Every structure is written in structure tokens, then in C-alpha cells.
């Protein structure tokens, strides 16, 4: 198929370091690798990561009316039979273009965007935002979501909309090549977090748990890689616990450098805070698994499914249980090895090729048969 993939969110720059940017690059490249002709249209090209290997990349203009015209021109110029859009608060231009040209639109939904914006970003017109969202979903041909919680959410907003759950993926070759080394020449056990520093990621709680663990485990070290709005509070938590000499705060790391960071670790943590609607399918967790790292995680949302038998789970927001899981892995090299091997095996189910195949199935379901030529 000829596919147009659209991302109108300026906060997700194509070459950016955060997970959303990595997802845009990797799913678009995976669809191209599957045999489709993929045009990628994004609002921002900024960042330091390399562009994905797709047929063509276009930067969208700012005014939404101009974007709709630009999207329509791209559909016509490249004979696109379907549009896949990463749903955002700024969505709408692709819907207008698709309606005018009678081309099916499939939304890729990675979060309940309107509710998230009201909760964390000060969105004031909640009811208007939800009404607009419902209109966009009802006009779409289908939706692809990354978690079961999101499937429930989208189906509640638009009951007639076909919804497929497709978890995020991981570049198996890149991360498995950088599996943890056992020949570092020291006995330090490195516990790591790699990802955006956002309030709901719970990195401050990880620092608190590490502080308790460090009192009785002199061999442990904490490695934190990432940037975001919570970075200042994370640094403050480290200073308050007098842990500056035992915590490495690396700041923002390019995505192509993440495997090398993971290769220095012995175990990894996804310390999410409890929420009523945990909708994440974290790239970081899948990358931890592919790198052969045991994962410590809260038993919430789809995380038990994503981690499988490759980690230790604890009740969300239970700091003592988090400390216990960390301590158990720190003190048992055999357990770390067994869970690490299970992690690599389990990660094979989440390669981007499989993700692209599942997304393709949804796209093919909404495209007339005569338009589906070219898909592998």
C-alpha cells in the first residue's frame, strides 16, 4: 500500500530523544520495510537522532488550514490509499483531507490525549476537547491503540469504531547486540532507569527506594538517563538523600546510544506511579527486555503482560515492596541471569516487524481491495 503517516504534534519532533519520537521513527521504518511506500509528514524535524528509512519525509506547515491542503496534496501526489495519523490535540487536518478525498483515516492512539492534557498540561476546555475528540474518532475508519486500557477508552468514546490493540515494539537486533556484559572487572551492581523524566514515571520514588537499599548494599549504584520536567525534582531527591556519589544522572541520551547505556546495567526499573487508567505500553520496558535485563515494575495496566516472566512485580506505589524487589535481584546473581535470559526470549514477541504486520492488517481492513497492492 501507499501509506501517509501523519504526526501534527510539534512536541514530538521526528529526530527527538523521547519515546514518542522513537516510536514515530520506528513504526514508520517498519511499515516501509514491510514493503509499503510510506510518506512521513511531521510538524517538527528537530533533534539529533537519524531519520527513519522511509520513502519520503515532509515537514508540515503551522496553520491547520494549510496543513489540510498539504496533507491532501501528499495523498494525491503519492497516490496514498490510507492515512495513519498519530492522534494528538492538534489532529484535524488529516481528517479534513481524508473526508474531502474519500480516503480512509486510521488513528494511532497512544494516550487519552485530552484527559492527559487536562490533568498535566492545564487544558481548560475539557468538555469541548472531549466533544471534538469524539467527532474525530467517529469520522475515522479504525483505530490502533497500544494497550487494553486505551482500547476501552476509545471504544467508550466511539463505540462503533473498530479498534485493534497493538503493543509497542523494539529493535531486537540493536538492543540484543548490547546485552549486559559480565566482565566489567568490578562488583558494582548497577540499577537503571532510561526514559523521560515525567511526574507519572515515578523516578523520585525510585531514588527514595534506592536510598534505603544503599544503606545496606554498598555495592549498588543507580544510573538515570533521560530528560524532562521532573529532572530538577529528581536531582533534588538525590541531593536530599546525600547520594550524589552513588547516582549517575546522564541527562538526555540519543536513542541510538540507549543500547550502550543499557549494556552497563544489571537490572532496570519502570517505577510508574499508580493511576486510575494506566494506558502505557512503554518502549523502555521492551528495550530493557531486549537488552537482557531483569525488569522491576509495578503490577499495573499491561505491564505484567509486557514483562511476562522476565522480572519482579510489586504493588503500585508500595515503596517497601519496590525496595524488596531491588534487594532480591541485587543479592541473587543467578536470579538476575535467569530473568535476563527470559527477557531476551520474551522480547522476540515484540519486534517492530511484527508490530508493522499487525498495523498493516488494520489498514488493509479499511482499504478497498483494489488499493492494497504493494504490501508484502
Region annotations inferred by a language model:
Residues 232-259, 267:
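Nucleotide-activated donor-binding/catalytic signature segment of Leloir-type glycosyltransferases, i.e.
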Amino acid at each position: 500500500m501507499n501509506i501517509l503517516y501523519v504526526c501534527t504534534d510539534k512536541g514530538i519532533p521526528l529526530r527527538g530523544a523521547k519515546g514518542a519520537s522513537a516510536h514515530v521513527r520506528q513504526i514508520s521504518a517498519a511499515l516501509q520495510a514491510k514493503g509499503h511506500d510510506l510518506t512521513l509528514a511531521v510538524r517538527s524535524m528537530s533533534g539529533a537522532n537519524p531519520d527513519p528509512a522511509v520513502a519520503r519525509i515532509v515537514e508540515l506547515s503551522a496553520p491547520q488550514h494549510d496543513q489540510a491542503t498539504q496533507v491532501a496534496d501528499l495523498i494525491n501526489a503519492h497516490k496514498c490509499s490510507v492515512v495513519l495519523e498519530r492522534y494528538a490535540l492538534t489532529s484535524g487536518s488529516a481528517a479534513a483531507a481524508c473526508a474531502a478525498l474519500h480516503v480512509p483515516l486510521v488513528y494511532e492512539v497512544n494516550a487519552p490525549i485530552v484527559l492527559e492534557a487536562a490533568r498535566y498540561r492545564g487544558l481548560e476546555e475539557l468538555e469541548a476537547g472531549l466533544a471534538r475528540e469524539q467527532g474525530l474518532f467517529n469520522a475515522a475508519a479504525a483505530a490502533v491503540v497500544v494497550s487494553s486500557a486505551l482500547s476501552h477508552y476509545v471504544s467508550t468514546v466511539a463505540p462503533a469504531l473498530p479498534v485493534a490493540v497493538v503493543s509497542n515494539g523494539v529493535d531486537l537486533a540493536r538492543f540484543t547486540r548490547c546485552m549486559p556484559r559480565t566482565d566489567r572487572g568490578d562488583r558494582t551492581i548497577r540499577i537503571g532507569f532510561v526514559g523521560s523524566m515525567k511526574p507519572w514515571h515515578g523516578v523520585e520514588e525510585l531514588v527514595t527506594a534506592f536510598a534505603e537499599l544503599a544503606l545496606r548494599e554498598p555495592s549498588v549504584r543507580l544510573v538515570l538517563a533521560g530528560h524532562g520536567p521532573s529532572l530538577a525534582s529528581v536531582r533534588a531527591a538525590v541531593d536530599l538523600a546525600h547520594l550524589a556519589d552513588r547516582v549517575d544522572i546522564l541527562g538526555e541520551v540519543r536513542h541510538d546510544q540507549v543500547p550502550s547505556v543499557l549494556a552497563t546495567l544489571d537490572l532496570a526499573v519502570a517505577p510508574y506511579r499508580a493511576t486510575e487508567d494506566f494506558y502505557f505500553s512503554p518502549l523502555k520496558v521492551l528495550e530493557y527486555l531486549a537488552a537482557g535485563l531483569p525488569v522491576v515494575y509495578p503490577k499495573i495496566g499491561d505491564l505484567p503482560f509486557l514483562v511476562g516472566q522476565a522480572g519482579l512485580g510489586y504493588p503500585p506505589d508500595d515503596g517497601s515492596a519496590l525496595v524488596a524487589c531491588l534487594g532480591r535481584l541485587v543479592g541473587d546473581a543467578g536470579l538476575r541471569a535467569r530473568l535476563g535470559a527470559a527477557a531476551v526470549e520474551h522480547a522476540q514477541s515484540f519486534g517492530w516487524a511484527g508490530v508493522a504486520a499487525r498495523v498493516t492488517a488494520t489498514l488493509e481492513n479499511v482499504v478497498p481491495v483494489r488499493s492494497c497492492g504493494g504490501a508484502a
